[in-house]
């Protein structure tokens, strides 16, 4: 289970993201406010809980079981999130393949690499058969040119990512078709592959996959900066002194910069996927 510090970090990350967007990209907040419960479908899992990040971020969503997913009528304007382990039937695999081909977005984590992506989209990515230990690694965000990420992340951001024991490293089989959004040299050195977060186009839709679990249950500190109270991270994001009082009341002095930074990066990554989906649907309507 996540430690209390990470639960608090996710609550603070939501406030920080909205405050940062109000200053840098107010139009983005209006788009995000148009997300409806039926737009985001979370398939329950045993080991990951993406819905916890969605809830902390203030996103509306619907939760269904794998059995209900098999019967569900999916729309191409939706995003389907599949929590680890992603154990689904062959019928559901074909349903998801068709869903993405018609324009839907699919977001999976960890063991779903083997149980969902390999059978649904063969020949693109696979599990490299070298499971991880329970560890925290430094990650590098490669997609910083993305307009949304530019508006909320800074060059000083240096997030760490939690890997649960037996996470599945991602081997890319077709580098020309699979984009690495976040990578880790530490994972490559220890387990043979660097990708942390990837995406690829399929038909009119997009598939996203992340190693380990999206809801980070713990963090660690490696530098004095990361060990400092998270108020320093809040200030570095441009939050003024008067507005900082809100964060103090929310307990920002009780968690570290490392905890808030990891939760903020996780939250931002999720919002980025939702924004890309909204933008693509808007462009399709204008065609």
Task: State where each predicted segment sits.
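Helical hinge/lid and interdomain linker segments adjacent to catalytic or ligand-binding clefts
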Residues: 36-120
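Hydrophobic/aromatic beta-strand patches that form the interior of the parallel beta-sheet core
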Residues: 107, 181, 208-210
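Conserved anion/nucleotide-ligand pocket segment
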Residues: 158-166, 180
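Short, surface-exposed beta-strand/loop micro-motifs that present aromatic residues
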Residues: 192-203
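Short, solvent-exposed loop/turn segments at secondary-structure junctions
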Residues: 47-48, 87, 113-114, 186-187, ...
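Extracellular ligand-binding/catalytic regions of CAZymes and related secreted enzymes
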Residues: 1-38, 55, 205-206, 212-287
């Amino acid at each position: 289970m996540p430690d209390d510090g990470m639960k608090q970090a996710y609550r603070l990350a939501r406030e920080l993201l909205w405050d940062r967007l109000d200053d840098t990209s107010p139009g983005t907040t209006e788009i995000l406010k148009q997300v409806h419960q039926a737009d985001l479908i979370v398939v329950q899992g045993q080991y990951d809980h993406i819905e916890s990040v969605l809830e902390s971020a203030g996103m509306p969503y619907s939760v269904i079981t794998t059995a209900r997913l098999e019967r569900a009528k999916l729309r191409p304007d939706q995003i389907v999130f599949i929590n680890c382990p992603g154990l689904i039937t062959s019928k559901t695999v074909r349903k998801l393949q068709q869903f993405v081909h018609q324009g839907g977005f699919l977001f999976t984590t960890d063991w779903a690499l083997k149980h969902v992506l390999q059978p649904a989209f063969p020949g693109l990515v696979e599990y490299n058969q070298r499971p991880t230990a329970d560890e925290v690694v430094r990650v590098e965000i490669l997609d910083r040119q993305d307009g949304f990420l530019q508006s909320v992340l800074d060059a000083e951001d240096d997030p760490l990512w939690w890997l649960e024991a037996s996470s599945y490293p991602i081997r890319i089989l077709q580098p020309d078709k699979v984009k690495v959004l976040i990578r880790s040299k530490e994972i490559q050195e220890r387990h043979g592959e660097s990708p942390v977060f990837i995406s690829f186009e399929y038909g009119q839709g997009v598939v996203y996959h992340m190693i380990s679990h999206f809801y980070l249950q713990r963090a660690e500190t490696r530098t004095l900066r990361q060990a400092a109270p998270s108020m320093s991270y809040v200030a570095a994001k441009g939050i003024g002194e008067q507005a900082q009082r809100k964060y103090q009341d929310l307990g920002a002095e009780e968690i570290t910069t490392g905890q808030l930074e990891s939760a903020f990066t996780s939250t931002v990554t999720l919002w980025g996927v939702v924004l890309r989906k909204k933008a693509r649907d808007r462009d399709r309507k204008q065609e």
